Amino acid sequence: MEFEPALIEVTLLRRYKRFLADVRTPDGREFTAHCPNTGSMMGCMEPGSRVWLSHSPDPKRKYAHTWQLVEAEGALVGINTGLSNRLVEEAIGSGLIAELAGWPGLRREVRYGDQGSRIDLLLEDGERRCYVEVKNVTAAVSEGVAIFPDAVSARGSKHLEELMLMVREGHQAALVFCVQRGDVHTVRPADAIDPLYGQRLREAAQAGVRVLACGARVWPGGVVLERVLDVDLSRAG
């Protein structure tokens, strides 16, 4: 996907209250932008970082600008979690993810299970179904290695339990890590941050949930998933 109109490059002053970021333009003007990422944004919110914002002309919006990209340790990183479903859908459509190819039908945000949850993407072929949960990944902890989650995620563990239930009911299920950065080759569960999530992820993989990861090419003009990444479920240490 490409950003249209072009993004605006500014300097990050601070990110706060999860949804807000103060920035400064090259000519010294300061204002507040919307931050579309509720995670900890570990390693992606250092004051002084170069960031890129999109602009909306909608007069009803409280904040006209939305934070899209940040330069972190020399890599451009897409921090907008709202783009991840679209990116994975595009990757499925292009055939990048072989494990999810060949499904003629696709629906978004479909209710499923007995708790009223919504699945990010539902692939269908007649009575056959594949439930696809998407997780946006931004945190990298060492050269080429990204982790998820970057904060304790009870919701993430719940989603894994629901995917396992779908497999037990005879359906297919997959979790796709959408890594919006180009300097990663492997994704690992963040056991040091959320050990329960790591446990549930391994249980899900053993139960038949496909655990997949794709890496993006990120540039100021857009983001596209273009590589399949390794997923390492071995226990650290």
From Swiss-Prot:
It comes from the Bacteria. This is Sugar fermentation stimulation protein homolog. It holds the Pfam family SfsA. InterPro entries: SfsA, SfsA_C, SfsA_N. One of its GO terms (molecular function) is DNA binding. PANTHER family: SUGAR FERMENTATION STIMULATION PROTEIN A. Belongs to the SfsA family. It comes from Thioalkalivibrio sulfidiphilus (strain HL-EbGR7).
